[in-house]
Structures are given as C-alpha cells and as structure tokens.
Swiss-Prot record:
Its EC number is 2.1.1.-. Involved in pre-rRNA and tRNA processing. Utilizes the methyl donor S-adenosyl-L-methionine to catalyze the site-specific 2'-hydroxyl methylation of ribose moieties in rRNA and tRNA. Site specificity is provided by a guide RNA that base pairs with the substrate. Methylation occurs at a characteristic distance from the sequence involved in base pairing with the guide RNA. The lineage of its organism: Archaea, Thermoproteota, Thermoprotei, Thermoproteales, Thermoproteaceae. Interacts with nop5. Component of box C/D small ribonucleoprotein (sRNP) particles that contain rpl7ae, FlpA and nop5, plus a guide RNA. It comes from Pyrobaculum islandicum (strain DSM 4184 / JCM 9189 / GEO3). This is Fibrillarin-like rRNA/tRNA 2'-O-methyltransferase. Pfam families: Fibrillarin. It comes from the Archaea.
C-alpha cells in the first residue's frame, strides 16, 4: 500500500525544487514533471493538486545529494541554458530539464555511445525538447563547439582526472560573462592514494587559478563517498 502525500511545498532556497511530505512524516525532494505520466529512471510519480511531481533521489543524483546536504545556492532557474558534461543516462539532467522548463536548454555531452543511446531513449524520445544530446569527449570542447551556443552554467560530473581543468576549458569556450560553474569532484577518479580532502583542495585551487570565485562547497556523504559539489562564478 502506498504512503499518502500530505503536502508539497516549494524548497526554501532553490527554484523549481519541491519538498514532498508523506503521512509517515518522511520528506523527499521532487521536481514538477515536464512530461506528465513519464518516468526517466523508475522514480515515483506524485500527484498533488492537479500537478505531477517526480521524486528526486539523492542516492541517484549528486545534485539532489548536494541539496539535501544543505547547499544554499544553485545557479539554475527557469530559462537557464546549461552545458552538462557527463550526462550519463540522464537522471540529473532530467530533473534540471524540469526546473529550467521549456525556455531553458541543456546541452548534454556523453562519451559512451551505449549510454548516449539510453539518454536519448529516456529523455529526448519521451518528449523533453529542452535537452540537446551530444556524443562527445568533454576533454575536447572544440569537437562540439559548433553545436553549443553561450551558456549560463557549465556543470561537470565525469570520472576523469583533471576534472576542474576540463570544466575550465569548457567554460573558456562556452560560458557567458559572469556565468557559473558546478563541479562534482570525484576524488577517487583523480587520485586513489590521496585523502579526499586534499583532492578537493587541489581541484578548487585549479578553479581559482583559472579565474573563478568559489561560492560554496558541500560534501556529498552519505549519498556518495569521497565526492563534493563546488559552485563557482567566473570573475
């Protein structure tokens, strides 16, 4: 038997993010479904007052984990244009798609052809017209420069060394003046021998050296071990 929803409220800090309260007292994040009736990764669909919401699982999405862990500022609004590096099969991009709405746009770069096909099946083929799938390697932004116009945000979530460098290189190509970057640091993908905190510092210093002001850093435990989310702005 499903647990009844007793309330849905707007998140106090983040546009387009909602908090769903259930009758047992538990609360879950959600976004308003841009394509009602359709799921992306098996998430629960929640009906409330003639609207449909998609539960946003912090164990499946590092952005959701950052929100649950108290990040105060995320530079994503209705109409935001974003370059998303490491789109994978589309879990987090799908929720960003809900948030930015029909006026927004998410250029979604994925390296693996198999995963790329899955992304298209789950998002584009299901009617998410604000998502532009790009099969490419985030290390080489010139390869897809003819597809991407200036963006408000560059987001990266890749299992590569030099994650901050890859992000900054893409920002040099595509980020509008005064734009923001969102860096998911995967410490074990950079150096399995160093403490995660040292790897975080190293990547943050790379962003600073490339002209970014660090606005906020949040660790993602217990949802993702040795991961952190960094929000920064181009000076």
């Amino acid at each position: 038997m499903s647990i009844e929803v007793v309330d849905v409220r707007k998140h106090e800090h983040h546009f387009g993010v909602y908090v769903v309260k259930f009758e047992d007292g538990t609360e879950r994040l959600a976004t308003k479904n841009l394509t009602p009736g359709k799921r992306v990764y098996g998430e629960r669909l929640i009906k409330w007052r003639d609207e449909e919401y998609r539960e946003w699982n912090p164990y499946r999405s590092k952005l959701a984990a950052a929100i649950v862990n108290g990040i105060k500022f995320i530079p994503i609004q209705e109409g935001t244009h974003m370059l998303y590096l490491g789109a994978a099969s589309g879990t987090t991009p799908s929720h960003i798609s809900d948030i930015v709405g029909e006026r927004g746009l998410i250029y979604s770069v994925e390296f693996s052809p198999r995963v790329f096909r899955e992304f298209i099946e789950k998002l584009v083929d299901q009617g998410r017209r604000n998502v532009v799938p790009i099969l490419g390697d985030a290390r080489f932004p010139y390869q897809y420069a003819h597809y991407v116009k200036g963006v408000d945000v560059v987001y990266i979530d890749v299992a590569q060394p030099a994650q901050a460098k890859i992000l900054a290189d893409n920002a040099d190509y595509f980020l509008k003046p005064g734009g923001y970057v969102m860096l998911v640091i995967k410490a074990m993908s950079i150096d399995v021998t160093a403490p995660a905190t040292e790897t975080f510092k190293q990547e943050i210093n790379t962003l600073k050296e490339r002209g970014f002001e660090i606005l906020e850093t949040v660790h993602l435990e217990p949802y993702d071990t040795a991961h952190a989310m960094v929000i920064a702005k181009k000076k």
